[in-house]
């Protein structure tokens, strides 16, 4: 499936990223995204059926056995928390609040 990189896509990405872009920046990002997608298209066209994997992202030799353990109580979980309120952990404010 070919992704069409157009102004609508750039506007959607801009809104998702919560950034403001000028026209020059939008054109540069549009060009960069097209180049990245073209590069992935080239990679996808490679025949790798006879190539053995050289790396596995998850090492199967270092996994521990699943064991049921006693969970922390609320008091234990909150014992080392710097900021708490009404029995809940208070985290940092997020964007827009």
Swiss-Prot record:
Reaction catalysis annotation: L-glutamyl-tRNA(Gln) + L-glutamine + ATP + H2O = L-glutaminyl-tRNA(Gln) + L-glutamate + ADP + phosphate + H(+); L-aspartyl-tRNA(Asn) + L-glutamine + ATP + H2O = L-asparaginyl-tRNA(Asn) + L-glutamate + ADP + phosphate + 2 H(+)
GO-annotated molecular function: asparaginyl-tRNA synthase (glutamine-hydrolyzing) activity; ATP binding; glutaminyl-tRNA synthase (glutamine-hydrolyzing) activity
Keyword presence, Transport: no
InterPro entries xref list: Asp/Glu-ADT_sf_sub_c (IPR036113), GatC (IPR003837)
The entry's keywords: ATP-binding, Ligase, Nucleotide-binding, Protein biosynthesis
Record keyword Ligase present: yes
GO BP of this protein: glutaminyl-tRNAGln biosynthesis via transamidation; regulation of translational fidelity; translation
Entry's EC annotation: 6.3.5.-
Pfam families: GatC (PF02686)
UniProt subunit comment: Heterotrimer of A, B and C subunits.
Described function: Allows the formation of correctly charged Asn-tRNA(Asn) or Gln-tRNA(Gln) through the transamidation of misacylated Asp-tRNA(Asn) or Glu-tRNA(Gln) in organisms which lack either or both of asparaginyl-tRNA or glutaminyl-tRNA synthetases. The reaction takes place in the presence of glutamine and ATP through an activated phospho-Asp-tRNA(Asn) or phospho-Glu-tRNA(Gln).
Family: Belongs to the GatC family.
Official protein name in the record: Glutamyl-tRNA(Gln) amidotransferase subunit C
The organism of origin for this protein: Sulfurisphaera tokodaii (strain DSM 16993 / JCM 10545 / NBRC 100140 / 7) (Sulfolobus tokodaii)
């Amino acid at each position: 499936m070919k992704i069409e990189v157009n102004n609508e896509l750039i506007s959607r990405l801009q809104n998702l990223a919560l950034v403001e872009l000028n026209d020059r920046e939008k054109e540069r990002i549009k060009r960069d995204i097209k180049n990245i997608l073209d590069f992935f298209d080239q990679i996808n066209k490679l025949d790798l059926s006879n190539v053995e994997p050289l790396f596995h992202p998850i090492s199967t030799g270092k996994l521990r056995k699943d064991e049921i353990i006693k969970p922390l109580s609320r008091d234990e979980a909150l014992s080392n928390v710097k900021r708490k309120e009404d029995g809940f952990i208070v985290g940092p404010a997020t964007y827009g609040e």
